[in-house]
From Swiss-Prot:
Keywords: Acyltransferase, Allosteric enzyme, Amino-acid biosynthesis, Lysine biosynthesis, Magnesium, Manganese, Metal-binding, Transferase. 2-oxoglutarate binds at residues 19, 83, 143, 177. Catalyzes the aldol-type condensation of 2-oxoglutarate with acetyl-CoA to yield homocitrate. Carries out the first step of the alpha-aminoadipate (AAA) lysine biosynthesis pathway. Does not display 2-isopropylmalate synthase and citramalate synthase activities since it cannot use 2-oxoisovalerate or pyruvate as substrate. One of its GO terms (biological process) is L-leucine biosynthetic process. It is an enzyme of class 2 (transferase). Contains an N-terminal catalytic domain fused with a RAM (Regulation of Amino acid Metabolism) domain at the C-terminus. The mutant enzyme lacking the RAM domain is insensitive to inhibition by lysine, indicating that the RAM domain is responsible for enzyme allosteric regulation. Mg(2+) binds at residues 20, 205, 207. It comes from Sulfolobus acidocaldarius (strain ATCC 33909 / DSM 639 / JCM 8929 / NBRC 15157 / NCIMB 11770). This is Homocitrate synthase.
Amino acid sequence: MLPKKKLHMKVGILDSTLREGEQTPGVVFTTDQRVEIAKALSDIGVQMIEAGHPAVSPDIYEGIRRIIKLKREGVIKSEIVAHSRAVKRDIEVGAEIEADRIAIFYGISDTHLKAKHHTTRDEALRSIAETVSYAKSHGVKVRFTAEDATRADYQYLLEVIKTVRDAGADRVSIADTVGVLYPSRTRELFKDLTSRFPDIEFDIHAHNDLGMAVANVLAAAEGGATIIHTTLNGLGERVGIAPLQVVAAALKYHFGIEVVDLKKLSEVASLVEKYSGIALPPNFPITGDYAFVHKAGVHVAGVLNDPKTYEFLPPETFGRSRDYVIDKYTGKHAVKDRFDRLGVKLTDSEIDQVLAKIKSNPNVRFYRDVDLLELAESVTGRILKPRPPENIMALISVKCDSNVYTTSVTRRIVLIEGVREVMEISGDYDILVKVEAKDSTELNQIIESIRAVKGVKSTLTSLILKKM
């Protein structure tokens, strides 16, 4: 095994789900959702939260204001960053809202200077210096983002960094705005910048246009970057930026450091998936449904003997669990293990017969536990009773009386022990309740408690068979 690498600097995360992430086409967060996401990011230990651009719209302003209020009350621990153009009014809004830091961005490549800013290099330097100084005069910390830095003239980039340092910025974000960096170049870039400007700390903001965002932020950290920009689920303009869950896992594996609470990554990723409306593909690293699911018979046999054969870290590291698929690729080890889990004892001959039936139906995508039991019963001629499930999770659909205010029912259901999440929904039912129970007896008690709530007309319970 290759030895773990060591970073020379301490590295932290700036998560930009609320700013960069909301720039994903079709994504809009409500004010309440912004606050909930910010609290979740703080809870997992994100060092900085880029809460948005307060001058863009009243709802973003209000969301950032509420997030900052929670910071002042000690509920949120992360540093709160407000995004800003190099415009005095934007800076005034960021200062007025009392953000911990104002992040001023300005495109510094010749393409940006000409096509977007309609200015010259010298005029841009004067404008940048003026706005950074103006922000600093308001008593806030200042980060300057060199937008499109990786396509800018390098000597001009150095001039820009010197200018913003002299004007009072203590951090500079190097933005690979169109995702054209590659890792070895990234490492060299940050090594050079950190050696030239030891009094400045550098961020890396890497877009994923060529699929190298995660590799580039790791290389930047090796080169001396102290803050890595991420979004949950890799949201952002076009194809997004480095995903928080993948960056955190890579830092753990390659450098042995935990920048956030890894066990809570799936939970916050699901929260953003729900609020953004952007579903993760099942094969997404770390938090995708298939991230720790094995299929090929040789793979499953190896994992059953020693999970390290096909897992770089245990899924429990990330609050996940491993599983495997039963289909035509399955071997005897997997079939035997699945029946052992169900508490059903079969002879070797019976397992071989079940496996033969599985392989004789090559177009079946996967076999559920109930399907396997039916196959086993057809082989053995016996009625098989699986072990009663433990640690049951279920979804309970609730229909309310027509003359009842649904929210009043929801508020009572939330208070029932064992209820984990309550959602008001459209369709034949009014409320969806996610519950967790240690056994079937406790589940029945929860169901009866829900049915006893005034205004509940009927319920329908569905057991959660598998959680990826």
